[in-house]
């Protein structure tokens, strides 16, 4: 009977190692997805501008992301998160090779949570501005600008998608790292 218990324990060890390796590979893939989301959001927002043509050459109306500090914060936040994710890739690849690395997973959980907070702050603040651009605010006499600056509004609205997707991916990365640590 003892021999069968020992055999059962040894047969679970390779399975556990395989699951840990699968979690580590999924971690690398999700980091690539988050990089694409945050980088695309930062680029889309950072290159957004629109000038309205009028009859005279002296009067021009222009909308740029840099006109609003909140959208500038969005670009900076997504750029920082994207840079962090790129720099964390080698550490994530180390987890594929050495799935027993405990302290580096703790470091990744800590920084992933910090980056989740940063991207959430940037995306939430930008979402409020995008809402105001589309709807305006009658009480404050802020008019909606999206009827005039339609291309500008489409791009700033679209850039939010990648950022919110990166938020979901960062939550998944934190859960994956926590699961990998709990299995130890």
From Swiss-Prot:
Localization in the cell: Cell membrane
Glycosylation sites recorded in the entry for this protein: 49
Spans through the membrane: 25-45, 73-93, 106-126, 160-180
Residue intervals annotated with topology Cytoplasmic: 1-24, 94-105, 181-184
Protein's membrane topology: Multi-pass membrane protein
One example of a Gene Ontology biological process annotation: cell wall organization
Cellular component terms per the entry's GO annotation: plasma membrane
InterPro entries for the chain: CASP/CASPL, CASP_dom, CASPL
One Pfam entry name: CASP_dom
NCBIfam families: A_tha_TIGR01569
Name this protein carries in UniProt: Casparian strip membrane protein 3
Organism: Oryza sativa subsp. indica
